[in-house]
Each structure stands twice: as structure tokens, then as C-alpha cells.
């Protein structure tokens, strides 16, 4: 029996059943994401720091990232057992509904779900439970990139977080603080114009960047593409996602 969705009294909730790789995920989300724009709390936060609630939307790039996590033979989820990582940890930045993080947890990785919006974290945690992710693999944290949490992570994942150029440097500062020396970062993006400016900034900040293309065919047969950016510290040479970075 499916659990009662969180925050039922705030706004109507919709259940999405998503076929991703070998799994069908149950993802709860607000039925009308646009209605959150009229929320007085959101309006107040927008006046403070231009915040907008993008988290209730199921973005195609998050589905493509989740599928790549679950299905790619080069995914850290598939290769961690071949490496010398002791107690590997994954972090999802801007987790929204938690789709990519749930995919990593389905592969056995402990995942810390983080978002700027506390409601997003509630949904991500609830969705993880609905998909039978063991509680010991799930941690949730409210996090502002300007004030990263303590801790280091071997694998950082994110989708659709590059839509504002003004946040690129802040995001990279957070990644630099949170990533282990030999860690890897996967960021998927729906090929937005703003995302094209991110790799040069990342290189300036001491990262190597590889770009590959993810493809997705939705239930309606519509094809979508997304860029997968793989980041890696420059002080380590390695092969990531099938691409040798030099």
C-alpha cells in the first residue's frame, strides 16, 4: 500500500510512475507546480534572493541522469566495487524530488539529498521511502551552496542546476569543498545556453571537464537530449565515463 504523500494539506499531490532502466519509480510531486508561485512564502523568498521553486518539476535531464546512473557500465555505481573506496558516499545537489539520488541509492550508495528548499527535501525523502530505499542509505539536509555542509563525498550528482550563470561560481565553490580528492561529479543539463558557460569556469577553478550526450525517449515517443558534464580535480588523471581526460 502506497504511503500518504507529504504536505497533503498544502496543495494537491500527484503520483508519477516512471520507467527508468530496469526500475519503475514512484515519484510524488505537487500536481500543479506553477501554483507554488502564488505561495506567499515563495513570494517573500523571491524578494529576498530571487528564489523560484523549480523543484516540483520532473525535468527530463533528471530522468536521463537517473537512467545513466542505473544503466551505464562506467557509472560509479557500477565501478565502486572495483575501486578502493571505503564506505563510498554520494551527494545530490539541488535534489528536487530526489530522482537521481534514488537511482544512486538503488545501486547501494548511501545518498545525502540536499536542496535549498526544505519542502523539496521532504518530498525527496518520502519518494525514497516509496521506492523502498533502506533508511540507512538516506540522509537529508537543507543546504545553501553559499554555506556548504560539513563532509566529503566521492560522487556528487545534480541535474538542471546551471540555469543561472550567477550561481556557477557559487556551485563550484561548494563542489570544491564537498568533493573528495579523487571524487567525481556528474551534472546533467538540458543543453541550456547558460550551461555552456559553466565548463570554462570549472576549468579556471581547477577541474577537468568532459562532456557527453544523454538521450531519452519519453512515454509519448518524444526524444530528448541532455549534456552530461563530468568533473574531476586536475590533480588526478583518470578515465571517467569512458572518456580519458588529459
Regions inferred by a protein language model and the residue ranges of each:
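S-adenosylmethionine-dependent methyltransferases
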Residues: 1-246
